From Swiss-Prot:
Protein name: Long neurotoxin 4
Family: Belongs to the three-finger toxin family. Long-chain subfamily. Type II alpha-neurotoxin sub-subfamily.
Record's keyword annotation contains Secreted: yes
Alphabetized UniProt keyword annotations: Acetylcholine receptor inhibiting toxin, Disulfide bond, Ion channel impairing toxin, Neurotoxin, Postsynaptic neurotoxin, Secreted, Toxin
Primary location group: secreted
Matching Pfam families: Toxin_cobra-type
Organism this protein belongs to: Naja naja (Indian cobra)
Locations listed in the record: Secreted
Domain of life: Eukaryota
Record-annotated membrane-spanning stretches: none
GO molecular function terms noted in the UniProt entry: acetylcholine receptor inhibitor activity; ion channel regulator activity; toxin activity
GO cellular component, one term: extracellular region
Function, in words: Binds with high affinity to muscular (alpha-1/CHRNA1) and neuronal (alpha-7/CHRNA7) nicotinic acetylcholine receptor (nAChR) and inhibits acetylcholine from binding to the receptor, thereby impairing neuromuscular and neuronal transmission.
């Protein structure tokens, strides 16, 4: 499977059986810069924590950088 990986946001091969994920969350600069974004691959979908949104998928390049919502 190929997944986009941060910080370069380039598509790279991941080991067999892994899933792609997009993780977003707010930090102290969220109002100015928008949500923080982490793209990658993992053996299993990461555990969701309070204030963190995680989306997992299992097809090539299914985790593009999310578009930002405009105010």
């Amino acid at each position: 499977i190929r997944c986009f990986i941060t910080p370069d946001i380039t598509s790279k091969d991941c080991p067999n059986g892994h899933v792609c994920y997009t993780k977003t969350w707010c930090d102290g600069f969220c109002r100015i810069r928008g949500e923080r974004v982490d793209l990658g691959c993992a053996a299993t979908c990461p555990t969701v924590k309070t204030g963190v949104d995680i989306q997992c998928c299992s097809t090539d390049d299914c985790d593009p950088f999310p578009t930002r919502k405009r105010p």
